[in-house]
């Protein structure tokens, strides 16, 4: 059983947590359909046990305080982003706990702007990293971090220990990559289908969606044309 833990804090982005964790939960469901035991146990860790209000206005429940957790019991530790992260960038007890956790967990990663928390802990020094496109400039302030702001995520099976993802829903793509590495591509694809993912995107794909380009056009006729083209690539477009 792999124990997957995600930090939560006031004003955290709820989808940074629920998106990736649902991927792991759905992987358990796929295994159950095959008569196999669950592969993952999921945990939320806060500064203290109890409800934590997200930026969406609803609360998630931290089952335990992170300071009480032995990182060696965790397979994967995820650090999400959100408006509340600014209060954590100089939260020395948390940053020190993350430093101590890093060599003891099998995998440590961030979702969205959670990369800034890892950067402030010094854990991204000498590593490539990405984050939400709106926070790339802030991450570039850390000179020892190789910022690759176009990437969807930086997870690689060849270097699986430390990784980051781009904004919000990119955390789902990151979690699918982790599931694929753990349980195989068929399970990851089954989860993507179950979650009605449009694409299972690789980590080196840009986080800017070409499919959203038509939405940026203010000319309705041009917008309609740009929407029509990718749906009709088999036709003569000359």
Task: Kindly label every feature range from the protein language model.
Residues 155-194:
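Conserved anion/nucleotide-ligand pocket segment
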Residues 1-108, 117-120, 149, 176, ...:
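Extended, subdomain-level signal for the structured scaffold at the beginning of enzyme domains
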Residues 125-154, 190-191, 195:
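A conserved active-site-flanking secondary-structure segment within enzyme catalytic domains
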Residues 39-41, 105, 126, 144, ...:
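A generic structural signal for alpha->beta connector loops
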Residues 87, 128, 164-167:
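Glycine- and other small-residue-rich loops at beta-strand/loop junctions that grip anionic moieties
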């Amino acid at each position: 059983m792999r124990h997957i833990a995600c930090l939560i804090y006031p004003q955290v982005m709820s989808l940074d947590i629920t998106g990736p964790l649902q991927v792991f939960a759905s992987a358990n469901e796929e295994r159950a359909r095959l008569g196999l035991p669950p592969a993952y146990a999921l945990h939320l860790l806060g500064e203290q046990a109890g409800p934590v209000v997200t930026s969406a206005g609803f609360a998630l429940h931290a089952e335990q305080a992170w300071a009480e957790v032995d990182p060696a019991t965790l397979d994967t530790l995820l650090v999400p982003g959100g408006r509340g992260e600014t209060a954590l960038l100089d939260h020395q007890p948390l940053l020190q706990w993350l430093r101590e956790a890093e060599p003891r967990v099998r995998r440590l990663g961030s979702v969205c702007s959670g990369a800034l928390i890892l950067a402030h802990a010094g854990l991204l020094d000498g590593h490539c990293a990405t984050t939400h496109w709106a926070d790339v400039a802030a991450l570039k302030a850390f000179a020892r971090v190789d910022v690759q702001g176009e990437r969807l995520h930086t997870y690689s099976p060849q270097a699986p220990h430390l990784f980051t993802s781009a904004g919000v829903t990119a955390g789902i793509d990151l979690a699918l990559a982790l599931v694929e590495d753990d349980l195989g591509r068929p399970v990851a694809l089954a989860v993507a289908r179950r979650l009605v993912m449009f694409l299972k995107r690789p980590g080196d794909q840009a986080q800017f969606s070409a499919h959203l380009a038509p939405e940026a056009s203010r000319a309705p006729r041009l917008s309609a044309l740009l929407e029509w083209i990718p749906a009709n690539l088999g036709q003569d477009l000359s």
